Amino acid sequence: MKLDLNKAKKRVDYLDKLRIQRALSDTPESFQQVFKLIPLLLHFNHPDLPGYVPGAPTSIANFHPNKFQQEYLSNILATENIKNFLKKHRTFKSEAILGVYVMGSIASIAQTPQSDLDIWLCHQENLSLSARELLQQKTECIQQWAKRFNVEINFYLMDQKRFRCFRYAAPINSENCGSAQYMLLLDEFYRSVIRLAGKPL
């Protein structure tokens, strides 16, 4: 049974990779860059990187920058050795973000070059209110950065407990106006979700 479960997890990971490839095909290069950098900008909080907010919680569980993300860091942090930077930030005291997921029309036949990105960010249950507010500010900064490339991002912050109990998770853009709409969002989430980084669902 355990072996079958491991195989199933690998198949889901493979399917996510295929769906990401499909999502990025026939999209502008600027969209692709923003899409690929979202996990990186959430994982690190550096003054030279977009989305920097002093004191904001950082680190995504099990996240390791890929080649594209490392090259981006090398270009941005030109005066800093990238290997030393990654080594210094390899171990965080705690991983504030458990997972980052994209949902909605992405990678579906409904996707268009104008499609926005609905990003669900699952954070630690014990994150303080002040830390959550700083994390929200960080996502808002990333939203503003993405708009420079004509990419719209909607972030939804939630913790494990609220998600499991189907309780309200407030989106930053305030489009979610009640628990009924949230349940519809939750249904859409499970039907269309792709894991970008962090722990599997």
What role is predicted for each listed range?
Residues 116:
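Active-site pocket-lining segments that scaffold enzyme catalytic pockets across diverse folds
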